[in-house]
Amino acid sequence: MLDQDTARALLTVAAAAGATVALVGDRAQLSAVGRGGVLDMAAQIRGRTYDMSELHRFTDPDYATLTLAMRDRKNPGDVFDQLAAIGLVTLHADDEQAREHITASARHGEAITVATNDDAAALNERIRTGRIQAGEVDDTVTATGSDGLPIGRGDLIQTRKNDTTLGVANRQQWIVQHITEDGTVYARETGSERKSPRTVMLPSEYVGKHAHLSYAATAYGVQGATVNGSHTMLSDATSAAGVYVGMTRGRQTNRLHVVAADMADARVQFIEAMERDRADRGLDHAAHAAQEAVRGLVTDGPVKFVTDELARLDHETERALRGAERWEQIADRRDTERAAHRAEDDESTAALRKAVEAAEQVRVEV
């Protein structure tokens, strides 16, 4: 998820230090928040690339092969059918039932992927309630995170802003160890391979602005993670990259949760999600996709209809203008004729007046 501005800054510093930079990534995953296409541009500029295609994460080789189909976005209906056949698709009556099921079934450390931050907050709140009821989280003394939800001892949280003075990084996860009365949070890093995980102190101001519960997260929050199992909630806001990222986090199992009436409905939703592709596959791919998207429109579609209508309106406008010109010419001729008629009328009136005056004069003389 390296954007162009960050890449430029990184490469500038590396060049000044005489360092070598190797860019590694999967272009089928989520794109950078800023301007993307960095991997594609680097490959075109240097021309020295290596395609790493061997899979190591998954314990099931058949599922590993299935993830390649997700990556390519090809035949999403077939992909769904295979997921359903091996029991990895769970249907729910509504969102609340889905949250209840995930709360009850998700194991500690498993990744839970949702489409939006609001979805994450709703599921985090429900999971936290379940952990309090199970005695895994102490709700006696709490701080408030950036999502507005309380944080207590035992909660899993995520820091969202790099801060070298505190020793924390964006998207880093922590288990809360202690909370003071003023809201200061002491937390131990999780997911680290250190023999002695670090503990950091997070001031209440930082927690309120840059930390929140992290049981569930968007695909941006779980991308790069490797865990034993994962759960992905499908919605109308889920993209193909979100499905691919969510369904490839778990070594052993990756479950898809869908609110749907039946498997046929869920299948349609899955196909629609796989057609919403937000992955950053480079400029060439984007240009090709744009060409394909407008190909039908240009030859026979809305664009042709609009073009034909504009041509028809132009023709009608020209005809109306020509008609207006003719009427103006006719009006000018009529004005000229009326002026001539007025002159003739004036002459006739003058002659009649003179004749009347002459007749009156004769009458007087007689």
Predicted regions and their residues:
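Conserved ATP-binding/catalytic motifs of P-loop helicase motor domains
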Residues: 1-366
